[in-house]
Amino acid sequence: ITYDLLTHESDILHLGFWQRAFEILRDAGAIRLEDDGKNIGCWVMSLADSPEFADMDDPDKILVRSNGTVTYTGKDIAYQLWKLGLLVDPDGSRHDFGYRRFASWEQEAPAEPVTYGSGSRLLARTTSNTDEAAPGEPYGGGRSVYNVIDVRQAYPQKVVKEAVRVLGHSDAADNSVHFSYEMVALTPGAVREI
């Protein structure tokens, strides 16, 4: 498995990805500002109508805390909308990163290691300077998105998928896959034997 883009989480906030996602969610009625109870002052997404979350005692997910801090799940929703090409500005243009060349690389065969520093393939990184255009084909706008993330993120990834669905993009939600992996703990003795 290889990849061609390193994204900087800070760019999601600096470039207004979350702000735009927030506006889309708010305007669609997918989130609400709590005015009482334990979540007072928080922006929450209600999951009560989703069969996926039907058995939960508290099916509300906080996306913005009362102090204004955006949660990881909120940022993940914005990032997922970008990955799917659904983070669109009011003028119809896609909200996007700036891009900067990071490294070139090559790989002789799928099972061979990647060699950085030479080769024809490019590894780019995001930047908050949107004047720096994508080198080659644009990123984002995928038909399917596979998020390879630790199994401990299963619940937030379900929330991300549901956010895409409640915005009216059922096909995109169905094509949003959390490809989870488990963590392995090795004893020092086991590590020495490896």
What are these regions (language model features)?
Residues 1-194:
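Alpha-helical recognition segments enriched in aromatics with Gly/Pro capping
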